[in-house]
Amino acid sequence: MSRKLCTLNFTLSGKQGSLVIRDIQLWSNRPTASKSTSELRGQFIQYVDLAKLPLWVRSTNMNTYRCYSTSATAQAYFKSKLRNANRGIVIELFDKVDQRSQEPAYLIIFRENTELNCFQVDLTMKHEFDGQVTKLKQDIGKTRASVSKEGSIDIIIQQSQQRKIGTKTEVYRNVHINDKRLQFNETLSKLILGGLRLRGISNSITDYQKLYKITFDAAEFTHRDELKRISMGSGEEVSFESLQETVETLLKLFTKS
């Protein structure tokens, strides 16, 4: 059951002064501990291309919130600025900080099909990368300080490089796995949307989103073995031709065309 979490107001600054976008309601389908709703305040930072965001910006288990507004100004603003499906609006929150770094928290508002959604930027992986870089610098500093005591600079440098290579290899491996899964999702989504358009199925049709979702889920199930191998780091990307054939078969089945 959906529940209203909070209301967001944020400020747009420009040459003509400031404009406040008001009454953006954030709703969640997940249960939360707090039963009271709050008001968040923030300011517009910039527009971003969602396809070019770093992988650490979004985690696989993060919350995505539905956004609604009864404000005509807010509705007109989002309609104008989010025409591009890959565009996002970055908002810096005044009243909320990242618990780990105590840095400002950020929301990204975007449009998915006909729905307006948002998510909070996940800084967890960024902090892990920063921590690894800091540790590597500390290790190198300790190594240099103890060169004269150890008496063998070659061994010390080799040990330091091995530690760096091991850490980088693990990070690159995880990033590579995430890239493959993200590419699968993006390709699958584009194929489904293209297939629906070719069949003359408009997103204004009542069952459009339902048809999109069941096709997406069925395609994931069809390629579950390949996705499992990808998640273990031992599989190749699902080929475009294979995924296209799967989508065509499913759409023929679901649309009876």
From Swiss-Prot:
Protein origin, superkingdom: Eukaryota
A Pfam short name: Sld7_N
Location relative to the cell: Nucleus; Cytoplasm, Cytoskeleton, Spindle pole
GO CC field: chromosome, centromeric region; cytoplasm; DNA replication preinitiation complex; endoplasmic reticulum; nuclear envelope; nucleus; spindle pole
Keywords: Cell cycle, Cytoplasm, Cytoskeleton, DNA replication, Nucleus
Keyword Transit peptide: no
A Gene Ontology BP annotation from the UniProt entry: regulation of DNA-templated DNA replication initiation
UniProt cross-references to InterPro entries, sorted A to Z: Sld7, Sld7_C, Sld7_N
Role noted for this protein: Required for the proper function of SLD3 at the initiation of DNA replication. Binds to SLD3 and reduces its affinity for CDC45, a component of the replication fork. Required for mitochondrial morphology.
Family: Belongs to the SLD7 family.
More info: Present with 1690 molecules/cell in log phase SD medium.
Complex formation: Interacts with SLD3.
Stated name of the protein: Mitochondrial morphogenesis protein SLD7
Biological source species: Saccharomyces cerevisiae (strain ATCC 204508 / S288c)
Record lineage: Eukaryota, Fungi, Dikarya, Ascomycota, Saccharomycotina
